[in-house]
């Protein structure tokens, strides 16, 4: 700390003591992938997106809660499945200024083929459990690191049509049976 004195015409103005302490800013860097680390996931009844979140600037010993949810990139809207937001949270006590945590989101993505999903996060300080304070967020709909593509499930069917004896050539007639 240091003192600054401002004076003019023998009048001194006391500005108090100045310090150059600053409040640390918490940064969030994330990568959303499949369980296998892929950026594409095949549409299905039960898919899981794993969000790996690197946090920097935490206060050791402080209790935090990381909340996350899925967004539809093209619509810039929350992903709702059966009317409910696809979300999850993780509560932890910081054991270091830098930490890496994972949050998983498992949901029915059967109808989401061709959609890009983006994970959004908010970090809350729970020092006062009655009044959580948001200390950081990462909500960028254009962030490729937070984006996963749900791909269409393509089912290929191969068939062979024959008559009842297995022949591929039939004679036109009134009572013809084709077996596929």
For the regions a protein language model found, what residue spans apply to each?
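Solvent-exposed loop/turn and edge beta-strand elements of beta-rich ligand-binding domains
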Residues: 1-180
